[in-house]
């Protein structure tokens, strides 16, 4: 779910003391240096990011109810995109994802499997309740439907179930965040079922603001996920975790970190997150336009700020830098801000699970 709280509650005074971080002029970058990695063409509004061996994949969500709820949001009839870039930020391929006319919701999470080149795939979360599978590194037809929300939520769009982010476990299952508020498990054959529900992970507005970003920790034993704007801790952004067991209970839910919502300021609004090898957790804050850094125990140890940030949404490691998508959540949008930014953080990312999903291509 995406939401500029200012668009819902009205204009609020907000003038945080941010320390801008721009790319260092020296050859050795400093922690927090920010530069432009790539420019995103229309329809813009980059959300998801995934880093492959020699490609960077970016998903878009130009359709956006939450850009301006009072007017019905930003409507998009031109489809969404998955853009492929090389490691230098050059656009090399574009895949069009068809959407409904005047769509008000698009794409977010991306996950790569570990299949060899002949059967390598990208899994794409459509926030209207689908997972699409896109064949990579070969000629292929349009993306195929891999999974969708089951009854009674099927066919009702994001109002009933919004699949935001997705991440593989070591067995090839996909775990999905849904801000209605639920967490889902999708088996390797595409069967989706609710894995966890609890009123404490609901967003402030009930139908919005709940689970958004999700990643598995270095131990492989916990799913960490963000709450954009909490109802249980009103206005705060929260990082929770759950053990990766078959049926987690309410007592299994653990608070990792709470981002306070100071009175008179736009709430922080957590979006995507990413783990470093060290166990540090990087969290995009789209309200304050910052990246927060938590240590493995959940204590905040740093904030990265830059005037280049505009709704820093998706996060993925490339070397010792984070790639960060500028979602540009506002109406009207600012095309000049449709960027993928590169943030030097001085440590490497945790390798994501990339299971084999097919035996084809073996020799």
Predicted features and spans:
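Short, conserved, GDST-rich strand-edge loop motifs in beta-rich repeat architectures
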Residues: 59-78, 225-235, 327-338
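A short loop-to-beta-strand structural motif that recurs across blades of beta-propeller domains
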Residues: 69-74, 78-83, 130-132, 182-185, ...
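Beta-propeller fold detector
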Residues: 35-38, 92-98, 142-150, 193-199, ...
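Short loop/turn segments immediately following beta-strands, especially the blade-tip
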Residues: 134-139, 241-249, 345-350
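Loop/turn residues immediately N-terminal
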Residues: 63, 128-130, 181-182, 287-290, ...
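A short helix->beta-strand "capping" segment at the edge of beta-propeller domains
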Residues: 25-42
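Flexible "stalk/tail and boundary" regions
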Residues: 52-55, 85-86, 90, 113-121, ...
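Beta-rich, blade/repeat-based domains predominating
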Residues: 41-54, 68, 99-121, 151-180, ...
């Amino acid at each position: 779910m995406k939401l500029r709280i200012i668009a819902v509650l009205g204009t609020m005074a907000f003038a945080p003391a941010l320390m801008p971080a721009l790319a260092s002029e020296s050859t050795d970058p400093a922690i927090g240096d920010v530069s432009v990695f790539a420019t995103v063409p229309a329809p813009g509004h980059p959300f998801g990011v995934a880093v492959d061996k020699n490609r960077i994949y970016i998903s878009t969500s130009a359709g956006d109810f939450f850009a301006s709820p009072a007017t019905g949001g930003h409507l998009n009839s031109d489809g969404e995109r998955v853009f492929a870039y090389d490691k230098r930020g050059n656009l090399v391929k574009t895949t069009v994802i068809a959407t409904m006319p005047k769509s008000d919701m698009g794409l977010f999470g991306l996950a790569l499997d570990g299949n060899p080149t002949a059967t390598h795939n990208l899994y794409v979360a459509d926030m209207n309740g689908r997972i699409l599978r896109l064949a990579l590194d070969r000629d292929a037809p349009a993306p195929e439907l891999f999974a969708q929300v089951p009854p009674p939520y099927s066919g009702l769009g994001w109002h009933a179930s919004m699949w935001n982010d997705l991440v593989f476990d070591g067995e090839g299952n996909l775990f999905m965040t849904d801000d209605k508020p639920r967490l889902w498990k999708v088996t390797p054959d595409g069967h989706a079922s609710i894995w966890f529900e609890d009123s404490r992970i609901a967003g402030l507005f009930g139908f919005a603001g709940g689970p958004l970003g999700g990643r598995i920790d270095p131990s492989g034993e916990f799913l960490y996920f963000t709450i954009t704007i909490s109802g249980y801790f009103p206005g705060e952004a929260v990082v929770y975790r759950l053990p990766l067991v078959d049926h987690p209970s309410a007592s299994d839910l653990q608070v990792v970190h709470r981002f306070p919502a100071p009175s008179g300021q736009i709430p922080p609004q957590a979006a995507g997150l990413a783990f470093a090898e060290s166990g540090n957790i990087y969290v995009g804050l789209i309200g304050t336009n910052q990246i927060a850094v938590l240590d493995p125990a959940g204590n905040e140890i740093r904030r990265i700020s830059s005037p280049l940030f505009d709704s820093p949404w998706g996060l993925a490691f490339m070397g010792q830098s984070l790639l960060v998508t500028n979602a540009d959540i506002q109406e009207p949008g600012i095309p000049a801000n449709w960027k993928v930014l590169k943030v030097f953080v001085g440590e490497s990312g945790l390798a994501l699970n990339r299971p084999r999903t097919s035996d084809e291509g073996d020799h």
